[in-house]
């Protein structure tokens, strides 16, 4: 996911469908909706255990939140939504839970593909997908291929994903190209390095949401969230629905995004420096 200098999109590029204007929150400025929202969907298991249910019940209920948040993003004109669906560390969970998560993913992709196509959303995937079970990988690849030509919202699933692993994989590809003489390592800059990341054509997240009442980023999009606004929700993921999403967007719109500039520079309309090494003071 490449660096992008826009702090908020100038106008929604995806149409507002399945929702009337009256359904939208009156305080949300549609001209300043984040272009790219990334979500760490945490708390499924804890939500279930707190209700005396098995952890997998939380994952099943979490699917409803996925559906609702995708529709909310579409309604508000978000251009890209990245969902942290399965981390590379999640392979260490009990085998039964992992198997159920894979089954739910396959089922979701199969049942939701018609709606995805209806709204011309484009499914993408990032992560070490070679570790997925064959049937799961086929389901993911089918959804990606089926929607490749769609021009609506990008829906990115982070699967078998880790931020450090992504950077390592990028470094390996870069090293191979340097060895073959395809690039000049001495002339490499941050933009050049970012082009080796999993989805370098997608702009960096503007807003990172984490549910589950935790205060950490859990190895998610480590390179890309350098200037993202962070919203930590106390809600477990199965409880995070449209209203909570709208609250996160309102929180985002109250922030002043400086990208290393002063407030005075931002107010005067100074352009953000393209350097990702600048610190936000």
Protein language model regions, located:
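Flexible, compositionally biased loop and terminal segments
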Residues: 1-281
């Amino acid at each position: 996911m490449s660096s992008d200098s826009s702090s908020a999109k100038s106008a929604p590029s995806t149409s507002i469908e399945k929702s009337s204007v009256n359904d939208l929150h009156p305080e949300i400025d549609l001209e300043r909706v984040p272009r790219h929202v990334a979500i760490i969907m945490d708390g499924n298991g804890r939500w279930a255990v707190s209700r005396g249910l098995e952890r997998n019940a939380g994952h099943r209920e979490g699917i409803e939140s996925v559906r609702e948040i995708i529709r909310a993003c579409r309604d508000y004109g978000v251009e890209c939504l990245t969902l942290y669906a399965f981390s590379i560390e999640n392979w260490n969970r009990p085998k039964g839970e992992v198997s159920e998560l894979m089954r739910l993913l396959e089922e979701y992709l199969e049942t939701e593909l018609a709606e995805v196509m209806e709204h011309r959303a484009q499914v993408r995937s990032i992560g070490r997908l070679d570790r997925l079970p064959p049937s799961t990988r086929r389901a993911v690849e089918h959804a990606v291929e089926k929607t490749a030509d769609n021009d609506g919202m990008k829906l990115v699933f982070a699967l078998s994903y880790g931020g450090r692993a992504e950077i390592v994989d990028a470094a390996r590809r870069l090293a191979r190209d340097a060895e073959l003489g395809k690039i000049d390592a001495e002339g490499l800059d941050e933009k050049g390095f970012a082009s080796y990341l999993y989805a370098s054509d997608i702009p960096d997240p503007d807003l990172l949401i984490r549910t589950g009442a935790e205060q950490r980023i859990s190895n998610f999009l480590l390179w890309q969230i350098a200037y993202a606004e962070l919203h930590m929700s106390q809600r477990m993921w199965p409880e995070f629905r449209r209203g909570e999403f709208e609250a996160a967007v309102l929180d985002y719109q109250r922030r002043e995004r400086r990208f290393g500039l002063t407030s005075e520079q931002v107010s005067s309309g100074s352009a953000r420096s393209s350097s990702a090494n600048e610190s936000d003071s």
